[in-house]
Structure formats: structure tokens, C-alpha cells
A protein has these predicted regions:
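Glycine-/acidic-rich phosphate or pyrophosphate-binding loops and their flanking alpha/beta elements
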Residues: 145, 285-288, 320-321, 339-354, ...
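Non-catalytic terminal/interface segments that mediate subunit docking, oligomerization
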Residues: 82, 303-415, 421-431, 488, ...
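Structural signature of the thiamine diphosphate
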Residues: 243-311, 432-437, 456-505, 644-652
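Cofactor-binding active-site loop characterized by glycine-rich and histidine/acidic residues
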Residues: 58-187, 357-358, 362-363, 371-372
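Long, well-ordered, tryptophan-enriched scaffold segments
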Residues: 20, 199-344
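Generic long, charged, amphipathic alpha-helical segments
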Residues: 384-385, 551-583
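Peripheral docking tails and interdomain loops at the edges
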Residues: 324-327, 332-336, 444-446, 466, ...
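N-terminal amphipathic, basic-rich helices that act as targeting or association modules
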Residues: 15-98, 263-284, 293, 297-303
Length: 652
């Protein structure tokens, strides 16, 4: 942009151009002046905005921590000290300041750098993070290990290095964070917890803890008075020399007055704050002081999510995680098409009108799961529990016991946190709870921590559970409607995708444990196909979102003169084995395709059923037992040998 060129020339002429591209490690910014730091922050924001505008990613959270990142890197020695970013979707400035500027244009792309911290990328990335509330426990473990190992080294007087856990106020609502807080308070090690308070997790925070932090923010009077006492004492050396105990006791008395009910103080922490999270100098002064303490510390900073980009400041929830967008006005690029999340959102509003017993629960993701619409229509029947998936599930069990019909909407990758609660608190008592697993299967661009490929293997073994997988918008609505009237717990898994093309057969009524057969002759083909036998010799068994690739494969096989039918399972659990065998008999080749891991998945189970029935030539395609990296959906499927071409090759 022309304005940016003039801006950079203006800065360069005044010696203020810091040249972000030349920064290779945090030590490079240690001697920057105040003006150079302000320029650096501006350059970082411009780079983040331009890259996320092109690639998509987490924008608002990253724009909010630019000054905080700079202050941390200037206050700590990165050769020995560890900075751990909770969730780590706010690590973009961290990456730009640790030698990854040249790779930053490939952020979240196939083969590019991750949108989260990743140990394989840099020694400055201490953990592979992606889920919330882990940093305090990880940081405490790292600090404890360093301390114990240093104690075993003879004649070693060097410090093992500081550990800093940066956690947001939203992530601090997670139970794991509180477990870590309690343990760190007990051990009394100098773990430094930086509480990044922007009043948001993804959407605006709700609940008691959010209100509690707001009250702490009001205690800024204490910090102002304390700083005034320090400044006064420093100006008159005799006071510090002869009355140090009096000053200390006076400040402790003030602390008791203003922070009498401060949870962190009660847990055994030194509490400092709240600080302006966009004032580098103020944060540096505090960070350099607290790292000298011999006890755990909470440094409370207030930041603004989306800072520096007006559209993100105005709507931080929209720009939390966003696809490619226009930098000029913040509008999302590309046509807006109906997604499975949209279908769920609309259907829940309709069902909520029909049945007053329906209640909805989410874990800090009302907009992402589509439940924001339900919350607006029926606020008294909507519960956002914060980042607390375990509580969400057990809470739902209690609601079901009380006679309501709870619908719990959680991403597939996050439901992993609550498997014990699903088993013990819902499936065991056979409570009627409906779990809507959004982002199931291959999830583009977010990488290993966000793939939804484990839910089938994790849940198929749980008694009493019914698991459904829709292949179209109509099937999703049909399954959700049916789930309301079912008994016991029900899981419906669906992808982060635009809805598949509707076929007439998808409108068939649900029949427990049975799917629907799609004949090769019913598939539309744009190309002239070779003549095929009237009887199909290949059967492609699939479920859910993989109907797209499987249909493409069947059409390609048809063009080669191979007639391939498709069996859409619909039910992942239970499976009517007798009916399934009757469908499969007569086919020479059977290919089973799923968007979950093969080990423990639906494919292995069906293969066992068919082999027991003496059927042969069966192939199972699914994700390998490994963590799947980032890329578009097509790239992820190709890497896992699950593309339409791979399915076609298996069917030949």
C-alpha cells in the first residue's frame, strides 16, 4: 500500500525503522529505545494483519499481546528462561521475534509454520500447545525438573532459569489451570504467571471468575498508592535506610486492606497488578522485580483484544479465528455457503421453540458451535460454562437426571478432555444427553492439536452410546430431530465443511443400525463413462463427510468401466451386523473409508464383521496412528491417503 511505503520512509529517515525481518532472536531488541520499541510493535502488527488477512488465523488475540511479548523478551534471558504460552494461538509476535520472519508468510499453510507453538520449529517453543489451561501445570513441571536437576549438580551455583506461564483470563476458567495454581502455591517455587486479562476467551467471558477479575481490576488504587510510597522513599534515602521495616509493614497493611479477598494471595502468591498490558516500560519494571522473588507470582496485565486494527477491536470475537479477509474493511473473502454448523444452529432454534425441555451447553464457544442463535432466543435455557468441558458434561448429566434434554456442543478435539465424564456421569447411568461434535474428522489449517480424528475410536467402546454421522444437511436435521426422542446418550459428529450435495436417498427415514445404499447408476457424472456391468462389483462403505471423496471416487471408477456402489453407514454405533453382511454379499471388492484413525475405528470393526461372515478382499482406509499436520482439507486427506484418487485406486 502507498501509505505504508511513505510511512516506512518517514521512519527510516528518523532512525526509527527497526527492520523486523533482521531480528533473529530476542536479544536483538534488548537495546531498543522507547521510540524504536513503539515502531517495532507497529511493524509486528502490520505483519500479523497482512499475513492473517491472506492465510486466515487467530488475529484479535495476537494483536492484543504485542507489547506484552516485547516486554517479556526484554525482561528475561531466553537462553535460560522459558516463556510458555497457554493455548499458544497468541504466539505470532513470539514467532516473529524468534527468527521466523522469513517463514511467517507460510503461517498455517501446508508445510509452513504452525499457528501454535511447536517444539520442532524452535528451541524457544517449549511445548506443543493448542488446548487451553495447560501452561501453569507444564510450567510448574519444567521449573521443578530444572530445580531438582540443578540440586544434583555438584559445585553448580548457576540459576536454572526462570519459567513464565502466560495465560488468558478465559483459559484460567479451566479446571486444570486451578489444579496447577493450587500445586504451585503449595510448592512455593518462583513460577511467574502472567495473567493476560482481555475479558475474552473466544467470546466475552461469563461467570463468577470473570466478575472476580473485574473486582481485582478495581484494586488499582492499591498499586498506585504502593508505587507512590516507593517513589517517595527512593527520593529520601534516609527513610529507606532507617525505616525499612516500617515501610514494609505499612505496605503489607495496605495490601491487606485492598487485597483482603484476593484469591491469588490466599493461594500463597505474590500478586502484582493490574498493569497496562500495552505499556512496555511499566511491564518491564514489574517483571524485572518479580523474577527476583522466591515465591510464585501472578502478574495481572490488562490488554485489548484486536488492538491496532479497528475491525478487530470492534468485533474481537469475529476476528478470534478467521479465514482470509479484506484488510481494508475486515470483510471475509469468498462466498458464504451453508455449513453443517449453520444447519445445527438453525435447527436448534426451531427445536427449542417446539420443546421447552431442550437446553444447550457450550464451553466458551457459543459462536463457533452456532449456539449463539439459541442463546439469543432462549437465554434462560443456554449455559456457557467457560473452558470447562469436564464440568459441561457432568452438568449435562445432572440436567438430564432432572428431566431436561441437554444438548452439549463441543469441538471434537475438545471432547477428548471429558471422556471420563461421558463414561462415568452420562453413559453409566444412561442419561439422555445429546453431544454435538463439531469439527470432526479432518480440520484444515490448525494442525495436530485440532484434528477431530480420535472421537470414533475413543467413543465406540463406551456402552449405551449411540453415534451418528450425517452425510448432508438433511441428514443432520433428521438425526438431531431423532436424537431428541431417543433414550440414553447420543453423539452426532459433523465436519467443519460446507454441506454436501443432497441426494434423494438422504431423505430416507432413519432405521436403527442401518445405512442406505447408493447405486452407481444414481450418481451424476459429467463425463462419458465406459459401459459397465449391470451388477456392481465394488462397494465403497463410508460415513459422514467422506461421502464427498467417496462419491468422486465412484464416479471416476464408473468412467473406467467399474461399477461401484456406495453404502452410507449413517450409524457408527450401533451397527446392524446382519443387515450389513446382507448388503455386502455379492460384491467382489469392499473398501471402507472413514475420517478417523484406523486403529479402533469403524473400519476395523466392520472388517472384522465381514471376515467373520467369510467375505474377502476388504480394504480399510483411515487416518494412520499419528498426529496429522496442518493444510487444507484436500492436502490433509492426500497426506493420509484418503483423497478421492486414493479411494478410487483402492476400488480398482
Amino acid at each position: 500500500m502507498l501509505w505504508r511505503s511513505f510511512f516506512l520512509i518517514f521512519l527510516n529517515e528518523r532512525g526509527l525503522f527497526t527492520n523486523l525481518s533482521e531480528i533473529k532472536n530476542p536479544e536483538d531488541i534488548k537495546n531498543f529505545s522507547k521510540k524504536e520499541l513503539a515502531t517495532l510493535a507497529q511493524e509486528i502488527r502490520e505483519k500479523i494483519i497482512s499475513t492473517v488477512g491472506k492465510n486466515g488465523g487467530h488475529l484479535a488475540s495476537n494483536l492484543g499481546v504485542v507489547e506484552l511479548t516485547i516486554a517479556l523478551f526484554r525482561s528475561f534471558n531466553q537462553k535460560n528462561d522459558a516463556i510458555i504460552w497457554d493455548v499458544s494461538h497468541q504466539c505470532y509476535a513470539h514467532k516473529l521475534l524468534t527468527g521466523r520472519f522469513e517463514k511467517f508468510d507460510g503461517l498455517r499453510n501446508h508445510g509452513g509454520i504452525s499457528g501454535f507453538t511447536k517444539m520442532a520449529e524452535s528451541p524457544y517453543d517449549y511445548f506443543d500447545n493448542g488446548h487451553a489451561s495447560t501452561s501453569i501445570s507444564s510450567g510448574l513441571g519444567l521449573l521443578t525438573a530444572r530445580t531438582l536437576l540443578d540440586n544434583h549438580k555438584e559445585g553448580n551455583n548457576s540459576e536454572s532459569g526462570k519459567v513464565v506461564a502466560v495465560i488468558g483470563d478465559g483459559a484460567l476458567t479451566g479446571g486444570l489451570a486451578f489444579e496447577g495454581l493450587c500445586h504451585a502455591g503449595q510448592l512455593q517455587k518462583n513460577l511467574i504467571i502472567v495473567l493476560n486479562d482481555n475479558q475474552m476467551s473466544i467470546g466475552r467471558n461469563n461467570g463468577t471468575f470473570s466478575r472476580y477479575l473485574s473486582r481485582i481490576t478495581m484494586s488499582s488504587q492499591y498499586q498506585s498508592i504502593r508505587n507512590g510510597i516507593d517513589n517517595f522513599a527512593n527520593k529520601i534515602p534516609l527513610i529507606n535506610k532507617f525505616l525499612p521495616k516500617f515501610i514494609y509493614k505499612f505496605k503489607r497493611g495496605l495490601k491487606g486492606l485492598f487485597l483482603a479477598n484476593n484469591m491469588f494471595v490466599e493461594f500463597g502468591y505474590e500478586y502484582v497488578g493490574p498493569l497496562n498490558g500495552h505499556d512496555i516500560h511499566e511491564m518491564e519494571l514489574v517483571l524485572n522485580r518479580v523474577k527476583k522473588l522466591n515465591k510464585p507470582v501472578v502478574v495481572h496485565v490488562i490488554t485489548r483484544k484486536g488492538k491496532g486494527y479497528k475491525p478487530a477491536e470492534k468485533d474481537p470475537q469475529k476476528f478470534h479465528g478467521i479465514g482470509p479477509f479484506s484488510i481494508e474493511d475486515g470483510s471475509v473473502k469468498g462466498p458464504v455457503e451453508l455449513t453443517y454448523t449453520d444447519v445445527f444452529s438453525n435447527e436448534m432454534v426451531a427445536l427449542g421453540e417446539k420443546n421447552k425441555k431442550i437446553v444447550c451447553i457450550t464451553a466458551a464457544m457459543a459462536k463457533g458451535t452456532g449456539l449463539d442463535a439459541f442463546s439469543r432466543h432462549y437465554p434462560e435455557r443456554f449455559f456457557d460454562v467457560g473452558i470447562a468441558e469436564e464440568h459441561a458434561v457432568t452438568f449435562a448429566g445432572g440436567l438430564a437426571k432432572g428431566g431436561l434434554i441437554p444438548v452439549v456442543a463441543i469441538y471434537s478435539t475438545f471432547i477428548q478432555r471429558s471422556i471420563d465424564q461421558i463414561i462415568h456421569d452420562v453413559a453409566l447411568p444412561n442419561f439422555h444427553v445429546i453431544f454435538m461434535l463439531d469439527r470432526s474428522g479432518a480440520v484444515p489449517n490448525d494442525g495436530e492439536t485440532h484434528q477431530g480424528i480420535f472421537d470414533i475410536a475413543l467413543m465406540r467402546s463406551i456402552p449405551n452410546l449411540t453415534i451418528l454421522s450425517p452425510a448432508s444437511a438433511f441428514e443432520l436435521k433428521t438425526m438431531l430431530d431423532a436424537a431428541i426422542d431417543m433414550k440414553g446418550p447420543v453423539v452426532i459428529r459433523y465436519p467443519k465443511l460446507v454441506c454436501s450435495e443432497e441426494l434423494d436417498c438422504f431423505r430416507a427415514a432413519l432405521d436403527l443400525g442401518k445405512g442406505i445404499l447408493i447405486k452407481a447408476s444414481d450418481l451424476k457424472s459429467d463425463s462419458k463413462s465406459k459401459s459397465t456391468s449391470k451388477k456392481s462389483c465394488t462397494l465403497l462403505i463410508t460415513t459422514g463427510s467422506m461421502i464427498n471423496e467417496t462419491t468422486s471416487a465412484a464416479i471416476s471408477l464408473k468412467a473406467k468401466g467399474i461399477s461401484a456402489d456406495i453404502y452410507n453407514l449413517r450409524y457408527i454405533k450401533p451397527i446392524d451386523e446382519e443387515y450389513l453382511v446382507s448388503i455386502c454379499k455379492g460384491y467382489k471388492k469392499i473398501v471402507i473409508v472413514e475420517d478417523g484413525v484406523k486403529q479402533g475405528g469403524i473400519g476395523e470393526y466392520i472388517e472384522g464383521v465381514l471376515l467373520k461372515a467369510k467375505l474377502k478382499d476388504i480394504k480399510v482406509l483411515g487416518f494412520p496412528q499419528s498426529f496429522i499436520s496442518q493444510g487444507t482439507r484436500a492436502e490433509v486427506l492426500k497426506d493420509a491417503h484418503l483423497s478421492a484418487q486414493d479411494i478410487k485406486n483402492a476400488g480398482i
